UniProtKB/Swiss-Prot annotation:
HAMAP family for this protein: Transcrip_reg_TACO1 (MF_00693)
Name of the protein in question: Probable transcriptional regulatory protein SPO1072
Pfam short name (any one): TACO1_YebC_N
Transmembrane segments: none
Organism annotation: Ruegeria pomeroyi (strain ATCC 700808 / DSM 15171 / DSS-3)
One Gene Ontology MF term: DNA binding
Amino acid sequence: MAGHSKWANIQHRKGRQDAARSKLFSKFSKEITVAAKMGDPDPDKNPRLRLAIKEAKSQSMPKDNIERAIKKAIGGDGDAYEEIRYEGYGPNGVAVIVEAMTDNRNRTASNVRSTFTKHGGNLGETGSVGFMFERKGEVVYPASVGDADTVMMAAIEAGAEDVESSEEGHVIWCADTDLNEVSTALEAELGESDSTKLVWKPSTTTELDLEAMQKLMKLVDALEDDDDVQRVTTNFEASDEVMAAL
């Protein structure tokens, strides 16, 4: 499990530091609109929409923005978007998965490819790095909900697969298809989570020093700046010292 909690932490650190809140909210809005369009606009009847709203709320997205995004779907918007996954290697051979939602496949592919090239990476075919990750559900709780044993018992009862507990909190993993049921059971036992979402969890990692991490983060930042890109995941491993120096 080494590195996975650090990997999760950098995702959260990035989210908190994202100065362009409007860009972040725009990505959440798109996900909410598409989720509502693909299923029921009632989150109680649409697990994907429920998770999208929960993640948006965890980043303090205003309720009005969320409601507007759902109304867009009811009004017919969201039809044009398709979900695409790009895979490739960043600098120093780090595996990178880019999840996009776009109304222009050619534009997005061109932008993602040029961003990889510009930052010392290489965009590959779909499946070129996917084998290094597993699709999992991830539920994050603050340390304040209880000690490791308490959370482990709740996780086992809820049907989760694994738990990582540290001073910073608890990360609970489950099968991707079980996320809605597991997160609902956890909430009944532990209260509302900090975060509940589907993720690509690295099964193998690449160790990076500070210089390599800085290069990688330039690529990740550039990819995340693209309006079509929803999410970027990598399989880096780094020491606490490197993470602290970023």
